[in-house]
């Protein structure tokens, strides 16, 4: 029991479980004996009905849209804490991840287009390498445990949130034609209600969660990625301590083990099972996957590092407290883990075309993400060698 307690108390444990879950998914998705069971689990229909409201999704979408909204709620709480009283609590430090995220979206997209500019069909996938999978990036970072400065973790979180927001805007503008104005109006009303609760210092977390469920449902029905609702809820829950009680910090403490040891491993298991059927060396070396690999593995760190360097030189932003520029560059490599959001964009970009394009895109995403994960982890391990953060 002591050994088990020590394992779950170790900051790296969540990352280890996530990697095991992802590896298990790859095995299950590619073994003939388990392939059918794996896909049957993901396609299991789950229906929720309350009066006239009906949400009917398969297991994969419930994990990605509902459980991951809880993960994004935790991320929102942590980023808010650092913006208000932590490593991003100045305008210049808060601007740093914003500028980094812009570079991390623009340069990978341009690099992808450099590979595929002559192919009008492949060009439609330009946004694929612009995305960062925050869950997997944080999971790999967690493998380094207490050596990671809190400010570096928060920088990655903030950058990835902005990256995700950018991806959601790109999807809405370029890959979605049926947004629901009614649902977006309900979502706007729910956000206004959350703002009023915060302004009037309502400190009962349950009320925020109740309004948050309305927000999540409206965002889901609108056609926009529903996980965005989690970040918004987290930003409105009061952080300020009164009578020794902070609603935001208390909720953060409650959510952390559930997210690390249940939600993220489930997410990894549900999304990492990429079938390698039909994959060939000639397919891997074609312009489409090569553009994605280059965008994720080279474009991401290059864009983040270049824009951060310019921001520092022009004094538009400053480094997060307790971090170095070399650590930021290493995190930039880790941001090349595109994975689930990149796969989602690829299915939208090529859904009405040759299905083989999606297979090639997934192959490029998987290869680029694995390279980014391995090299990013290795670089950070070197850059953080000997560092242990105080508890």
Curated annotation (Swiss-Prot):
Q: Which Pfam families match?
A: Na_H_antiport_1
Q: Which GO terms describe its biological process?
A: regulation of pH
Spell out the InterPro entries in the cross-references. Answer: Na/H_antiporter_dom_sf, NhaA
A GO MF term: sodium:proton antiporter activity
Question: Its membrane topology, per UniProt?
Answer: Multi-pass membrane protein
The listed locations are: Cell inner membrane
Question: So what does this thing catalyse?
Answer: Na(+)(in) + 2 H(+)(out) = Na(+)(out) + 2 H(+)(in)
Q: Does the keyword Transport apply?
A: yes
Q: Which GO cellular component terms are attached?
A: plasma membrane
> Which UniProt keywords are present, listed alphabetically?
Antiport, Cell inner membrane, Cell membrane, Ion transport, Membrane, Sodium, Sodium transport, Transmembrane, Transmembrane helix, Transport
The record's principal subcellular location, in a coarse class, is membrane
Known function: Na(+)/H(+) antiporter that extrudes sodium in exchange for external protons.
Q: What is this protein called?
A: Na(+)/H(+) antiporter NhaA
Classification of source organism: Bacteria, Pseudomonadati, Pseudomonadota, Gammaproteobacteria, Enterobacterales
Gene that encodes it: nhaA
